[in-house]
From Swiss-Prot:
It comes from the Eukaryota. Residues 45-97 form a coiled coil. The keyword Ribonucleoprotein does not apply. This is Protein get1. Residues 25-110, 173-200 are cytoplasmic. GO terms for molecular function: protein-membrane adaptor activity. Interacts with get3. It holds the Pfam family CHD5. One of its GO terms (cellular component) is endoplasmic reticulum membrane. The chain crosses the membrane at residues 5-24, 111-131, 156-172. It comes from Talaromyces stipitatus (strain ATCC 10500 / CBS 375.48 / QM 6759 / NRRL 1006). Gene3D superfamilies: Helix hairpin bin.
């Protein structure tokens, strides 16, 4: 079985990755993938896209037609455009409500898969130590804090280990992001450098 050390670290890493990427980005990606599945909603999504293209095409044709010189053609295009626009708006409302309910379901599933196991482990194994501290290395107050809230004295509790993992992952992520940004800025400066032969 996987150790508590690694399990809690992986849970905190998954939470950090989802929070860094952004929950809305993950939701949008899952929505796109969901629309690719063979289902009735994917058919509706294709119809929604076709209606949008039809509305745009009719609007272009209507704008290209003079309402004064070719009134009959323009009026016919206008009626077709209005009908297509009405269908598109109804389909857009329907797709919007479906997307909202899908995102709500994804939000619940994300919370249950990320925070649910973390909370379950922290409450169910609250008296179980993650690892033992070497005897005599730390004074009593430090041992008490590290075993907080209910782990045996002289051990590290799951809550403390979870907090330590979250902090370490967050700090490491910030360092990596800062290093990537700095290297990106340096490469941009090199690309924008003025050639030696030119003067300002």
């Amino acid at each position: 079985m996987i150790s508590f050390l690694l399990l809690i670290f992986l849970i905190q890493l998954a939470i950090y990755i989802v929070n860094t990427i952004g929950a809305s980005t993950v939701d949008d990606l899952l929505w796109i993938l969901y629309l690719r599945l063979p289902s009735s909603i994917s058919k509706d999504a294709r119809k929604h896209g076709e209606l949008k293209r039809d509305v745009v095409q009719l609007k272009r044709e209507m704008n290209a037609t003079s309402s004064q010189d070719e009134f009959a053609k323009w009026a016919k295009l206008r009626r077709r455009h209005d009908k297509a626009m009405e269908e598109y708006e109804a389909m857009n409302r329907s797709m919007g409500s479906r997307k909202t309910s899908f995102q709500y379901s994804v939000k619940i599933a994300r919370w249950l898969t990320l925070n649910g196991p973390r909370l379950f482990i922290q409450f169910y194994y609250t008296k179980t130590p993650v690892f033992d501290l070497p005897p005599g290395w730390f004074p009593y107050p430090v041992e008490w804090i590290l075993s907080f809230p209910r782990a045996p004295l002289g051990t590290v509790s799951i809550q403390v280990w979870s907090s330590a993992c979250a902090t370490a992952i967050s700090l490491t992520g910030n360092v990596v992001i800062a290093a990537l940004q700095k290297s990106g800025q340096a490469s941009m400066r090199q690309a924008q450098a003025i050639p030696a032969g030119k003067s300002e």
